Structure formats: C-alpha cells, structure tokens
C-alpha cells in the first residue's frame, strides 16, 4: 500500500513518521507546497520540535518515509490520502473570528480530484466542522473522472504537542468514521488495517463520519473546559485563602472526575483548544442553539480573564507600575516540550507589560527568536512594532535573561526552570526581587527563604507595596 499525506505540519509530520516506523510494508510520502518546509524535513533540523521525532524520522527517512513537493506524483501513486492541512479560524467574512476556514481542505480536495487516476480513500486528518466530509465528497464527485471511486473517512488526531510521539505509539484510542455503506465499511477496514500494525484492535473505534468529526471538537472542548474550571476556582482561592492545588487534589481524587487537566495556570494556548471551541460555538449558533453556544463561549472568556488577571497581578505587585522596569519572561511556547507559540498565554502577558512601558528579557529553550519578535509585533498585538523591538531582548540562556531585572515571570512549565540556581538569580536581580509563577512549578517556600517575593496562581495574594510600607512581608 502507498500512502500520501498532504500537509507537513505538527500533525502530518509526527503521524506519518510513526506510521512509517510501525508499518515497514507501507510507503508513505508526506507532501507540502512549501519547499522550505520540505527541505527542513529532509535536513538534520526538522521544522518542528517534538521529543523523539528526530530519531523516528532519521530511522525511516528515505526507507519508507519520503518528504516531497511533488504533490502530483504522490497523489497519483497513493491508495490512501490523508488531508492534514491547517484549518485556522476565519479572519474575515461570514463567521469571522469563529468559523473554521476550510480553504486549504477545499484546495486539497480539488487537487485530488484533478490529479487522481485511480480509486482513492481520502481521510480527513485535519480538525474540521461537522459534515465537512460531505463538502469534500461533493467536490470530489462533482469533478469525478469516469471509473474512479472515492471513499471519505474521518480520522481525527488526539495528539498533545510535547508528547505526540508517545501519544501515537501508545494511543488510548483511534477513531475512524465512515459512510454506513458496504464501500464505506471496506474503506474503514483498510485504514484500520494500517493502525492494527501497532494498535490493539479493541482500541480502534469506528463510528459514522459525523460522530467522528464532532468527537474531535468535543474532546478539545472538554479538556479546555477543565482548565477553565480550575482556573475560575483559582480566583476564588486567592480571594478566600484556599489553595487551588489542594482543591484540585481533593477534587481529582474523586474517581468520577480524575486529576488530569486540573493544574491551575496562566491559561491554555496552542493551535487547537481555542480554535476548536470557537468552531463549536459557531456551529451551535448556526444550528439555532444559543444557550449551548453561550455555554462554550464561557470557556474562552474565562481563559482570557485568567491571562489578563495574571498580567494585572504582576503590575499591581510591582507598586502598580512597570514603566521603565526590566522584567524577565521565562518561557514563550504555549506549553513545555514544543516550540509552538500559537495562542500562547505569554503573548498576552508580554503585550500587557509592554503597553505599560516595561522592557522585556525573554528566554525560551525551543522557540526561535524570530518567532517571538514576529508574535509580539503582529498587528493584532501592537500598533508600534518598532517600539516593541526596542523594548524586547531575546536571550540564549536564562541567567542572562534575569540579570538586572525587577521581576521574573514563568510563562511556560519547562522542566529546566525548576532546576535553576535561584540563589544566583536572586543575587543578579534588582531588589526587591519578584517571581511570578504562572505555571505553579517552583518551590515557593524555598524561594521566599532565599529572599524573593513570590506570587503564584490560586493562593491568596495581597497588595505587596501597601503591606511593605507597613513593614509587613506578604506571604503566599
């Protein structure tokens, strides 16, 4: 069997790499219009960072895994084609800011219809709205050549960036949706056969196409909902003296609830959660379900509130002004073990501090400096890109980033931040030295013993400037 994947991004790359590793009898070609991206996949420096990905790619590349810009040949030769292109939120027109923009999916479908010379199984890998498969099939059949048959399947990914390789190797389930026809069942069996090379058959769930499409949106909505739920309680904890970590542990020990995704933080980010919930909201609005749309909108609103609230906590704690103060930002990716900055909470934090006149010293072990500057100078973030460039300095190590700063802000939960020499950091910072732990990963008691004024999420905090004027050292 020959497989083609259109789209060499965060989903297509790791998925095809693991598939090639586990299916030596299958030839997989990953194609993309970007020659630069394909050149990176064929080099020693891959276009995305994902733990374990390098090793898998190097083992399979040019054996049964190929990266190419020759989309036409790959489509012609393939028996099965994954569509794994970006589905961003629309930025203009009907559904602006909510609906998924399916222009890349449509483009891929039209390419397949134009190029295909034999029967194809076409698989939605991208996250799409419910009934998107119907649109793809309409395009394929409207341009169908005589004697060519298409089957459309939905096979959403359930990967978490930073653990994608492990998620693929040890998937708790694989979901395949297809048409409830004899031909549809045969197509499902063929895709299932690929996964059965390494996934137990009982972990492969088959549904109709529409259930599969909605399940992906629902999964991300549920995960984001849990984060917003615990973050909402973090505000209550700060106002009452409760500790959100203790609350989360008590709640998570209930077997009906579980402990995953109950870590309070500065907020969720990434390419999926917000985009998919906005898509779900748009679907609900168009189905005349305003109460359902409002319910899921609150998950987004709470996340934005949490990011703003944390940013304001920094300003208020620093005597209600950060003008001309240097602040170190440790971590810019939306989570650890990835270089992805899409919808990262760090952008909101940095934007707020820059608007208040702060100068920022930023360090992230995997995000390229150019990416950080691009994010902070984007028109949606600032109207003064040159001013931002002057106020932001990117560092190659955390110790240079914190030197002579007034405060240190943890925006990403990188493991290396836990093991930093905080005595050395304290000595190099301006006094009083502040730490704002937006990911709750540090030993706050030890930091206080060193001399830091520590603020975190989900513990009662007080206006430190006022208390200090009374000679009181604030506690967490």
From Swiss-Prot:
**Any idea which residues are catalytic in this one?**
272
Which biological pathway?
Answer: Nucleotide-sugar biosynthesis; UDP-alpha-D-glucuronate biosynthesis; UDP-alpha-D-glucuronate from UDP-alpha-D-glucose: step 1/1
Q: Which GO terms describe its cellular component?
A: cytoplasm; nucleus
Gene deletion effect: 'Wingless-like' cuticular phenotype; reduced growth of imaginal disks and pattern defects.
Residue numbers binding NAD(+): 7-12, 32, 37, 85-89, 126-127, 161, 272-275, 342
Q: What does this protein do?
A: Involved in the biosynthesis of glycosaminoglycans; hyaluronan, chondroitin sulfate and heparan sulfate. Required for wingless signaling in different tissues.
What's the name of the protein? UDP-glucose 6-dehydrogenase
Instruction: Provide the species name.
Output: Drosophila melanogaster (Fruit fly)
């Amino acid at each position: 069997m020959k497989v083609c994947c259109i789209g060499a991004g965060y989903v297509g790359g790791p998925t095809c790499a693991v598939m090639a590793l586990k299916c030596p009898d299958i030839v997989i070609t990953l194609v993309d219009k970007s020659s630069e991206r394909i050149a990176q996949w064929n080099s020693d420096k891959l276009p995305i960072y994902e733990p374990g990905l390098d090793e898998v790619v190097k083992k399979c590349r040019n054996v049964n895994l190929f990266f190419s810009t020759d989309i036409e040949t790959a489509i012609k030769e393939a028996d099965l084609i994954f569509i794994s292109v970006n589905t961003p939120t629309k930025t203009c027109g009907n559904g602006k800011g909510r609906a998924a923009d399916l222009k890349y999916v449509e483009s891929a479908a039209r390419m397949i219809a134009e190029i295909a010379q034999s029967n194809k199984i076409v698989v939605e890998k991208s996250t799409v709205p419910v009934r998107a498969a119907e649109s793809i099939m309409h395009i394929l059949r409207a341009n169908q050549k005589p004697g060519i048959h298409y089957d459309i399947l939905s096979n959403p990914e359930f990967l978490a960036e930073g653990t994608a390789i492990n998620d693929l190797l040890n998937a708790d389930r694989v979901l395949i949706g297809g048409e409830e026809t004899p031909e549809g069942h045969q197509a499902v069996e063929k895709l299932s056969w690929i996964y059965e090379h390494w996934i137990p058959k009982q972990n492969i769930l088959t549904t109709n196409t529409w259930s599969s499409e909605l399940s992906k949106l629902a999964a991300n909505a549920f995960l984001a909902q849990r984060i917003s739920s615990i973050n909402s309680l973090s505000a209550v904890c700060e106002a009452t003296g409760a500790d959100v970590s203790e609350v989360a542990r008590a709640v998570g020990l209930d077997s009906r609830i579980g402990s995953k995704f109950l870590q309070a933080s500065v907020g969720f980010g990434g390419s999926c959660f917000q985009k998919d919930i906005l898509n779900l909201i748009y679907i609900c609005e168009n189905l005349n379900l305003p109460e359902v749309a409002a319910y899921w909108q609150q998950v987004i609103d709470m996340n934005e509130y949490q990011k703003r609230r944390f940013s304001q906590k920094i300003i208020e704690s620093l005597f209600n002004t950060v003008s001309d103060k240097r602040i170190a930002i440790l971590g810019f990716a939306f989570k650890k073990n990835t270089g992805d900055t899409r919808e990262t909470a760090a952008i909101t934090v940095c934007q707020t501090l820059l608007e208040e006149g702060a100068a920022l010293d930023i360090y992230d072990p995997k995000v390229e400096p150019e990416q950080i500057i691009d994010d902070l100078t984007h028109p949606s973030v600032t109207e003064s890109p040159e001013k931002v460039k002057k106020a932001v300095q990117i560092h190659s190590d955390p110790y240079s980033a914190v030197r002579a700063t007034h405060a240190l802000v943890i925006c990403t939960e990188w493991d290396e931040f836990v093991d930093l020499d905080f005595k050395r950091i304290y000595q190099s910072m301006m006094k009083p030295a502040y730490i704002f732990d937006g990911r709750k990963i540090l030993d706050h008691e030890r930091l206080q013993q060193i001399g830091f004024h520590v603020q975190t999420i989900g513990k009662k905090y007080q206006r430190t400037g006022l208390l200090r004027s009374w000679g009181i050292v604030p506690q967490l």
